[in-house]
Amino acid sequence: LFNHGIRPAVSVGLSVSRVGSAAQIKATKQVAGKVKLELAAYRELAAFAQFGSDLDARTRRQLDRGSRTVELFKQPAYSPKSVEIQVALLWSLQNNFFDDISVEQIFKASASLQEYLETGKEDLLNKILHKKKLDDEIESELKEAVSAWKSTFQAA
């Protein structure tokens, strides 16, 4: 492609996003779809917001949520997250559990939630891993677990 003047040499059929999505488990697809759309909208709004300071409340909420999403995706080098933790964190974001946590505290909150799930909710994580999709039972357990974590989390 590069030698044919197509620069950058990106083949849509081999694109990482297309191949990556095909390799994801259904649970990841269930929570990631909405997040992808929100991130795209956030990037558009963030670019637009640079030119104007008078933003309505809805736009401000979208920008805040987008900032939280970006922070949630940050992780230290050589510290991969298991697929079941990724699903749980994205589900928590999608279901507004991070909305009242400041952007600066999102990293701490996500690490705290991950520790909570890994040390006390192994059965739930195993269900996500083995069923590979979010059904009503898993969503109910996620809601219960994340609500319990949220009641104890202190964003100091």
Where are these regions (language model features)?
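Conserved catalytic/coupling modules of large nucleotide/cofactor-utilizing molecular machines
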Residues: 1-156
